[in-house]
Amino acid sequence: MMITGSSLYAAIDLGSNSFHMLVVREVAGSIQTLTRIKRKVRLAAGLSQDNHLSPEAMERGWQCLRLFAERLQDIPHNQIRVVATATLRLAVNSVDFIAKAQEILGCPVQVISGEEEARLIYQGVAHTTGGDDRRLVVDIGGASTELVTGTGAQATSLFSLSMGCVTWLERYFTDRNLAQENFDEAENAAREVLRPVMDKLRYHGWKVCVGASGTVQALQEIMMAQGMDERITLAKLQQLKQRAIQCGRLEELEIEGLTLERALVFPSGLAILIAIFSELDIHCMTLAGGALREGLVYGMLHLAVEQDIRSRTLRNVQRRFIVDTEQAQRVAQLASSFANQLKTTWALEPLSQDLLISACALHEMGLSIDFKQAPIHAAYLVRNLDLPGFTPAQKKLLATLLLNQTNTVDLSSLHQQNAVPPRVAEHLCRLLRLAILFASRRRDDLLPAIKLEAEGENLTLTLPEDWLDNHPLGAEMIEQEYQWQSYVHWALEVK
């Protein structure tokens, strides 16, 4: 099917640090990204003390928009939204910049209020991020920071604060010195900005905290590169601050996983985030799946926010790769029953059980490529697909489980993922393998009543009397599975 211009949508965000363009098309109630262009314009750096935007900064912005304009020519105007944020809200001569910007792009540019920006960010998060739906969303931009609480699709409080990674860089790291004093000043200033809104945020409360900005993205990249789990904590932020202080100067800042492009505004963003964690007593934060641009796009498409984003993602993937959903359900029921039977001994957390059920939903997707090496194909697809609702570490765990669903077990891959502890990954893998094995006849009426018990790492399977005698192929498969598990010292006893 040819993609026509009318099925395309574009969202452009003229931020204080970067200009971004996102071009998508709608597919099965979700969006498929076709183009993402990002240019570091650092508009906020061109803002003088009396809030005049310098000609040089304006020219950098216009130059970037000329690139964007070429891509917009094929998209209907009513399917394009261009918004400008903090710096253009502040600049007294923003009218001059916007007039030329509209001429270049051939469509209107809307300067949105801080509250509207916060609302759109929240919508972008609600459409793309899994987990508990009572959340606090934090987005540190170039010149403003948005803090939003909400439940499901509904924001309950919206705040846009005048601090950002570019303005804090210019204000507190002017000498490009990464000294403790600079960090202290930057953090204290951020705390002052936060104090007036803290009580209101706490009043609404949240169960999970998600970050939706370049600073949080950079932290995620650092943690993945260093083999840590993906949860951002105050201890990790303090550790990274000490590393930055050791580097001494901004131009010498070297942290494994931190790209050169993000390095310039990383210390200032880090200082703001440390202040937010300390003042709001945040225990842990994860990266959001989308923010402002996604909020704009979903708004144009008028798509309702699904309560369970992961379920929507799994359904879309199953449809796309022609997965036998009845078989996936059968395997999921068995895996769920096994997990419940081991509730007291292995005590899998709800999130771990969810990820096990997600692996069951996708375990046969590799068959759409070829039966041979189907688990390898499935793992590759999961690693490389965009899966809204799943974090990068969760995707890696799913891929690892799918890779190890049959035949030999690659223990090192289960230990290299960092979504769950290695021992939990082993437990999930064992339950998935057994569920697949016992559902192999692909019929509900042939699922045996299996009793599963665990003592430490030793698993005991109790089958109905005469089951092994009446099912020679099944007995052979269980014997083979016993061998595979014993190779990695997983004790499996069959009664």
UniProtKB/Swiss-Prot annotation:
Keyword terms of this UniProt record = Hydrolase
What name appears for this protein in its UniProt entry? Answer: Guanosine-5'-triphosphate,3'-diphosphate pyrophosphatase
Under the heading CDD domains, the entry gives: ASKHA_NBD_EcGppA-like
Enumerate the InterPro entries for this protein: ATPase_NBD, GppA/Ppx_hydrolase, Guo-5TP_3DP_PyrP, Ppx_GppA_C, Ppx_GppA_N, PyroPPase_GppA_Ppx
Pathway-wise, it operates in: Purine metabolism; ppGpp biosynthesis; ppGpp from GTP: step 2/2
Group of enzyme by EC: hydrolase
Record field: catalytic activity: guanosine 3'-diphosphate 5'-triphosphate + H2O = guanosine 3',5'-bis(diphosphate) + phosphate + H(+)
> Where on the tree of life does the source sit, at the highest rank?
Bacteria
Q: State the function annotated in the UniProt record.
A: Catalyzes the conversion of pppGpp to ppGpp. Guanosine pentaphosphate (pppGpp) is a cytoplasmic signaling molecule which together with ppGpp controls the 'stringent response', an adaptive process that allows bacteria to respond to amino acid starvation, resulting in the coordinated regulation of numerous cellular activities.
One of the GO BP terms on file: guanosine pentaphosphate catabolic process
What EC number(s) are associated with this protein in UniProt? Answer: 3.6.1.40
> What would you give as a GO molecular function for this chain, any one?
guanosine-5'-triphosphate,3'-diphosphate diphosphatase activity
Q: Which family does it belong to?
A: Belongs to the GppA/Ppx family. GppA subfamily.
